[in-house]
């Protein structure tokens, strides 16, 4: 078989067709703290100096990021994340409320009050307060989510932009904030989950509004680029180690109808590879996600009991899989790496519909030489 382009390889893999080999990539960029550690462990400084900033769409805000573009250095298949701004416009004024030599408490551009430990960019901040407490707050913040605001699209959005994307041979990926993720960003996890029971009418309004907002915000983008958008991810993070934050019953009542609307719009425009991004153990919700039009999951966090081999056996070709390489095994060393890869890749490569990737961001406790060994060993199974 002749060598495929990254896009051809991705699409063949995701459609259970033959490819020259599996894609080699990290589905999430390698973060700053990890790169800083690797520079002390052998990563050439020349590979970092001069790197341009890339755009990375985070949960609610599109932002310019200092993530290192590792595609060329490691020989990854390129995956480009499209930038549509699904965040509040105008942004909230970022301001510092308290600062010491150890931490800083601030209001961020999304309106969230949080505590940041100085000198650490990897990991989660401590979230302290959110903008929405009740229906009055919700009605007020809704004004910041106008799908017709032209600032939501790239500055160079034009016919030339479209023509340029049609010439690319790598994967084009659109990330959007999902329904649970949005409620969490607006209210905080515990208050939002409580709202499903304490004020179901408010929850229903948030879910309905968000489905309409997503569709109308991306409508021109999707209807113009159509199937040149190779895949879509709906970011949720609605599970933890021991299961989802909400029950299947709650998902079915509040989220399933909205999932069907969004995925129906995407599929109508030729986009049929639709992932949900959720850390933790999301297994109880998989049948409902499939019913809602989703056909892929990542990052399949091993520490939460997610296992790609088991999922492939249970769901067959109905479910696409990305991730599930245990970050802890890569940190441990060669023997653990070989066991992790050897126990999964032979079967998953044969069955198809799977792309190996570490089961979240590459953390700074993975030594550089371990990561290089992991990639070299992984290539034997692609």
Question: What kind of feature is each model-predicted range?
Answer:
Residues 35-93:
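Segments that shape or occlude catalytic/ligand-binding pockets
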Residues 1-45, 98, 104-107, 113-120, ...:
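Active-site loop segments of alpha/beta catalytic cores
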Residues 88-104:
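Short acidic, Pro/Gly- and aromatic-enriched capping/linker segments at domain boundaries
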Residues 124-125:
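Compositionally biased intrinsically disordered low-complexity regions
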Residues 85, 120-121:
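Residue-level detector of alpha-helical segments with a strong bias toward transmembrane helices
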